[in-house]
Structures are given as structure tokens and as C-alpha cells.
Amino acid sequence: MSQKAIKGYINLIIPAGGATPAPPIGPALGQRKVNIKTFCDEFNNSTKDTEKGVPLPTLITVYEDSSFSFKIKTPPASYFLKKYARITKGSSATKKEAVVGKVTMDDCREIAKLKMPDLNTKDIEAATKIICGSAASIGLEVVGN
């Protein structure tokens, strides 16, 4: 069986159950002659069990015959961190200038377990450090050991 020729890739962050032909999805798919309604229906169907509105990074592979496939990844670390810290927005200031909330090391470890498939490590301690770095970058203080 021969593989289809790949025309290109599209990276989008789409809310779960919220794929619509409106920007940014419609224009990105339309430029590559992909059937937008079909994509939206398939995406919304595959995310129907996920909490509505959760941002999902999605890699769409577009083939030469205008067909497509897509892979949905885990939500961004910042989404989980904000949820655990019970805040709606990260800090607009850099580093330690403005701490907007706190998360525990156990929270970071829990998030790392959820994010493991999308991180570039198989070691839970390294993954936890990655998540702690993300926490610092959005103005969260990591407490505990």
C-alpha cells in the first residue's frame, strides 16, 4: 500500500467541541482546499467527550488529494497550571516581578504525568522540571519540594 503524498501541515489550537469554519480554522484549511465542514464535524465528534472549550493543540496533515488526517495533543501546560492555581490569566510581567498564584510541586508532577505523551522526555522528574519552568514563565510560584 503506497502512502499519500503530503501537501503540508497545519498547527492550530482549537477549543474542544468548538471547531467552526470561522477564523482561524476556515482560512487555514481553505487555502489548502480541505473540506472545512468535514474537518469541523470530525474534530467536534472526536472531542465530544472532552470538556467544552479546553484548548487542544492539533496537527492537521493535508494530502495532495485534499484529504486530511489530524492528531489532537494534550492541552498546553499553561492551561493545566492556571486551572490548578485557580487563576484565569498568567502574569504579564516577566519572571519573579509579579507572582499571580501558587502551585505545589505535587501539582506540577501531576500535570507532568498528563503531558508526558507530548513532552520530549520519558523521565517524570525531567518532565516535572519542564512544567515548573512553564509555571515560572506565567508568574506562578512553585511551593513544596
Swiss-Prot record:
The entry lists its GO molecular-function terms as: large ribosomal subunit rRNA binding; structural constituent of ribosome
Does Ribosomal protein count among this protein's keywords?
yes
The entry's cellular-component GO terms read: cytosolic large ribosomal subunit
* SMART domains on file: RL11
Under the heading Pfam families, the entry gives: Ribosomal_L11, Ribosomal_L11_N
Tell me which InterPro entries the record gives.
Ribosomal_uL11, Ribosomal_uL11_bac-typ, Ribosomal_uL11_C, Ribosomal_uL11_C_sf, Ribosomal_uL11_CS, Ribosomal_uL11_N, Ribosomal_uL11_N_sf
Give the matching PROSITE patterns. RIBOSOMAL_L11
Alphabetic keyword roster: Methylation, Ribonucleoprotein, Ribosomal protein, RNA-binding, rRNA-binding
* Zinc as UniProt keyword: no
**Modification after translation, per record:** One or more lysine residues are methylated.
In the record, biological process GO terms are: translation
Q: Per its UniProt record, what CDD domains does this chain match? A: Ribosomal_L11 (cd00349)
Q: What does this protein do?
A: Forms part of the ribosomal stalk which helps the ribosome interact with GTP-bound translation factors.
Similarity-based family:
Belongs to the universal ribosomal protein uL11 family.
Q: Give the multimer and partner information.
A: Part of the ribosomal stalk of the 50S ribosomal subunit. Interacts with L10 and the large rRNA to form the base of the stalk. L10 forms an elongated spine to which L12 dimers bind in a sequential fashion forming a multimeric L10(L12)X complex.
This one is known as: Large ribosomal subunit protein uL11
